[in-house]
């Protein structure tokens, strides 16, 4: 589980920060909870490509992104509070290998 919090005027970056691959065959990213968030845009790239293949904002619990981590990289933009005192973004990440 990864929880990102932001309060006041701060912006909080996801962990790990930046565009990356997890080093497994597949990655499954489930949104568990999202409260008062601006940002948190998920982007998926082919390895080495400049533009994202997909870009979406997960807004509802259990919305999911599944990628082939051998071929793709992913990133999430920082979050900040919107419409409340604290932004919360909870994700469950499942990495697995076929063997």
What are these regions (language model features)?
Residues 2-60:
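Catalytic core of non-heme Fe(II) oxygenases with the double-stranded beta-helix
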Residues 41-99:
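Catalytic core of Fe(II)/2-oxoglutarate
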């Amino acid at each position: 589980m990864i929880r990102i919090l932001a309060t006041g005027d701060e912006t909080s970056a996801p962990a790990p920060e930046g565009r990356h691959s997890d080093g497994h065959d597949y990655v499954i990213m489930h949104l568990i909870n999202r409260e008062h968030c601006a940002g948190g845009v998920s982007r998926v790239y082919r390895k080495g490509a400049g533009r994202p293949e997909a870009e979406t904002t997960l807004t509802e619990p259990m919305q999911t992104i599944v990628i082939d981590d051998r071929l793709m990289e992913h990133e999430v933009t920082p979050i900040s509070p919107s419409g409340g005192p604290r932004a919360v973004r909870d994700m469950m990440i499942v990495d697995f290998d076929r063997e």
